[in-house]
Amino acid sequence: RGRPGNRGSYAALYLTGPEGSAKSTNTKILKSIVDPGTPETRTPGSDVRDLYIGAARCHVLNLDNLSHITRDYNDALCSIISGGGFARKLNYSDDEEMIFEACNMIFINGISIKLMPDLMSRTFQIELAVIPEEERKTEADLWQELEKLKPAILSGILTALSNALKEYQKGFITPPLPRLADFGKFSIALERGNGWIEGKTLEALKNNYEDGLE
């Protein structure tokens, strides 16, 4: 999906944790709420072009069970989060290009992935704990319960976004913003519009980045 003229950037979500912490399941659940459709998850292909092709067919690029991220994929993910493009010479042509553009939300999960600093600065990292045996559920039971809860979940999300948009449209002075300035400003509007503690989202993003550098 190319970037509409007035849309800013996203932040990535990285779920990590040991085996049995439901990393894949959690990203599937999140995607099913904000971007239902198939495939639920993707694995990186052999070429960064595959990322852009996949991004063009969804709103959330959900990358499952990654073990490492190469420099090329790191750069592509940063570009997709911020809204960018990738060009390649058109087959059987000497002077024509095929252009891929994308601006997508990205979910990543894996046991222990070392993110490079530029991607880390755009990412919220959450470490999950192992689910105790007595609390485990079958996929069928889990999804059945989720379907019952989805209307209330979506109602809460849409109400929060509506409050944020009202606040955003008022215009306000912001504190110093991160490199994801559009995301940062909207996060403040989200907090103000819903009566949440202001600055907590940007504080979490900053702490994630600093922890990732250690």
Name every feature range the model reports, one short phrase each.
Residues R3, K31, D35, N74-M98, ...:
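Conserved catalytic/switch belt of AAA+ P-loop NTPases
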Residues E19, L63, I69, K166-E214:
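DNA transaction DNA-binding modules
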Residues T41-R49, L66-H68, G84-A102, N109-D118:
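Conserved Walker
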Residues L128-L146:
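A short, charged helix-loop
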Residues H59-I81, S112-S121:
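Conserved AAA+/SF3 P-loop NTPase catalytic/coupling segment centered on the Walker-B
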Residues R1-R57:
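P-loop NTPase catalytic core of nucleic-acid-dependent motor ATPases
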Residues L115-E134:
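A short helix-turn-beta junction within AAA+ P-loop NTPase domains corresponding to the substrate/partner-engaging
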Residues Y10, G37, R57-H59, G84, ...:
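Short glycine-/polar-rich loops that comprise or flank the Walker A/P-loop
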